[in-house]
């Protein structure tokens, strides 16, 4: 119980009571201007950023009517001469920097402490590190549940989550003001615009932080109940959702379950259960009976309804048998397939053939969604026939080839873990012919005539030789190991985000 108390109790040293004065410091906005992110695009107003604008903005904020820069109905503020939304963006960026500094270290430390991955943290940051884990664990499990994290969440719930970490009242007034302003300005946080809200081009870091905060709160409760509360009865878990004095309620309920109950429900006692999430999709795999994983299904539904006030139907969580179902995760189709092998055993003058069936994880490249993504990017049509890229025809030959090669390398890098390379070769073929047709379009010729003019069809052979050249730096070019690796699965642990074309499906 002491461990549970230490886990849940919010220590006063973590509370931040003086965040609001940071919004009046010029260094915060300078940091916001120079602080980029690999996950979001440039919002476009950094070019307009200047120290003079920040000084004027801070001077205006010191006045009692500083929020007139937001409430003015005109497009440009008469005091400063700039668009009102531009100034709200500057303050919002400073707001995001303050909360990112506050929570980034806490999230990192709690994750490292929970999963004990301090030494190998750099490698496990890769999203491809999950696939070797799947190869080792999924073959021993029976059931898989696809969980789509529901949305939208009420804005006040986000404020309540932050209240457990921050005690600055002025900070929350400003946060509620941002919610109200952007809700009225863009009609955001509606069900139809949830994705465009949290990954908005105008406010990507702010809404991405809020979304991560929401997911972190939901997973912290889930993991705590999974790891620490194996003796609690199912009918009591609704009262856990008030975070204040959480550990006291758990202590009381443990005593009740021990004294008044002659048995313990095995709801939380699944030692062969694994939970994986990337962005808004989660996967729960288990070895136990369907009844147990079905209980977890309704646990998630009640958690979202009671703690986050989000209505989620039972049909949104699907439970499937791994032996009969393939699921989609991080751009791959994953399935468990039996692998039949025959072993000849000879004893004295008698020989026997022993058939062994072992399970293995199949990782397949989803060719149809990828062709759809390539067609959307104008590299081919909907049937997969390569076409030229007209918008690149004005570039130099070197730039055209370099852009196509970069895309092809990203595909090869991301999908080199596929068990079957036929689909990957098809994607390379589409990109290779699209590059040739783009070059032919630039030189006002056909693809066939363009290749004949060069006198050889070895043009762009890098599309097919990159992996072989990479492996030849480690193994001899004629070695069996090189050939086996070239056709086998290789997981790269330097991939931190999904491929751009994978994000389209």
Swiss-Prot record:
Gene Ontology CC annotations of this record: chloroplast
Signal peptide: none
GO terms assigned for molecular function: RNA binding
A Pfam family per the record: Intron_maturas2
Domain of life, source organism: Eukaryota
GO process annotations (BP): mRNA processing; RNA splicing; tRNA processing
Keyword field contains Plastid: yes
Compartments reported by the entry: Plastid, Chloroplast
Family per similarity comment: Belongs to the intron maturase 2 family. MatK subfamily.
Protein name: Maturase K
Primary gene name: matK
């Amino acid at each position: 119980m002491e461990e549970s108390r230490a886990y849940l109790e919010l220590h006063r040293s973590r509370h931040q009571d003086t965040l609001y004065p940071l919004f009046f410091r010029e260094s915060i906005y300078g940091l916001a201007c120079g602080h980029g992110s690999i996950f979001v695009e440039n919002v476009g107003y950094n070019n307009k950023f200047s120290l003079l604008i920040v000084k004027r903005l801070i001077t205006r904020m010191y006045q009692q009517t500083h929020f007139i820069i937001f409430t003015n109905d005109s497009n440009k503020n008469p005091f400063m001469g700039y668009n009102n939304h531009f100034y709200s963006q500057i303050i919002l960026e400073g707001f995001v920097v303050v909360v990112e500094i506050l929570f980034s270290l806490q999230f990192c430390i709690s994750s490292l402490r929970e999963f004990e991955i301090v030494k190998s943290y750099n490698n496990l940051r890769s999203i491809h590190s999950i696939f070797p884990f799947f190869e080792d664990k999924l073959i021993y499990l029976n059931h898989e549940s696809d969980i789509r994290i529901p949305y939208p969440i009420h804005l006040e719930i986000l404020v309540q989550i932050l209240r457990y970490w921050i005690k600055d009242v002025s900070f929350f007034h400003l946060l509620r003001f941002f919610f109200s302003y952007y809700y009225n300005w863009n009609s955001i946080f509606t069900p139809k615009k949830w994705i465009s809200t949290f990954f908005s081009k105008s406010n990507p870091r702010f809404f991405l932080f809020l979304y991560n905060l929401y997911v972190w709160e939901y997973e912290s409760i889930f993991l705590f109940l999974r790891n620490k509360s194996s003796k609690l009865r199912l009918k009591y878990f609704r009262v856990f959702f008030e975070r204040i004095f959480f550990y006291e309620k758990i202590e009381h309920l443990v005593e009740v379950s021990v004294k008044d109950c002659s048995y313990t429900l095995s709801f939380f006692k699944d030692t062969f259960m694994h939970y994986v999430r990337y962005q808004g999709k989660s996967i729960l795999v288990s070895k136990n009976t369907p009844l147990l994983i079905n209980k977890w299904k309704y646990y998630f539904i009640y958690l979202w309804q009671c703690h986050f006030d989000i209505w989620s139907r039972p049909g949104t969580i699907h439970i499937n048998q791994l032996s009969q179902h393939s699921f989609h995760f991080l751009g791959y189709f994953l399935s468990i397939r039996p692998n039949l092998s025959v072993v000849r055993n000879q004893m004295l003058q008698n020989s026997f053939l022993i058939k062994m069936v072992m399970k293995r994880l199949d990782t397949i490249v989803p060719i149809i969604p990828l062709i759809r993504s390539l067609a959307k990017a104008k590299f081919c049509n909907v049937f997969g026939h390569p076409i030229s890229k007209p918008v690149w025809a004005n570039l130099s030959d070197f730039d055209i080839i370099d852009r196509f090669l970069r895309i092809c390398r990203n595909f090869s890098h991301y999908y080199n873990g596929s068990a079957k390379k036929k689909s990957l070769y098809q994607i390379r073929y589409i990109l290779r012919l699209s590059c040739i047709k783009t070059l032919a379009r630039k030189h006002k010729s056909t693809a066939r005539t363009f290749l004949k003019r060069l006198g050889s069809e070895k043009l762009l052979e890098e599309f097919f030789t990159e992996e072989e050249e990479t492996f030849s730096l480690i193994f001899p070019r004629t070695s069996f190991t090189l050939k086996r690796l070239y056709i086998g699965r290789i997981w790269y642990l330097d991939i931190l985000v999904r491929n751009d074309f994978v994000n389209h499906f």
